[in-house]
From Swiss-Prot:
Tree of life domain: Eukaryota
InterPro entries found in the cross-reference section: Ribosomal_eL39, Ribosomal_eL39_CS, Ribosomal_eL39_dom_sf
Record-stated family: Belongs to the eukaryotic ribosomal protein eL39 family.
Recorded GO CC terms: cytosolic large ribosomal subunit
Protein name (database record): Large ribosomal subunit protein eL39
Keyword Hydrolase: no
Species this chain originates from: Ictalurus punctatus
Assembly with partners or alone: Interacts with impact.
Length: 51
């Protein structure tokens, strides 16, 4: 990744960084909840973004 990024790339990376987090614990406590964990987590070394 270049140190000089375009704003579009930077915005894309920021969105991916925000998506890559666990689900809050209070969501698991909701009644009838089936979500155990965030299945769309991405590890920086295992799966690349395809940039």
């Amino acid at each position: 990744m270049a140190s000089h990024k375009t704003f579009r790339i930077k915005r894309f990376l920021a969105k991916k960084q925000k998506q890559n987090r666990p689900i809050p614990q209070w969501i698991r406590m909701k009644t009838g909840n089936k979500i155990r964990y965030n299945s769309k987590r991405r590890h920086w070394r295992r799966t690349k973004l395809g940039l």
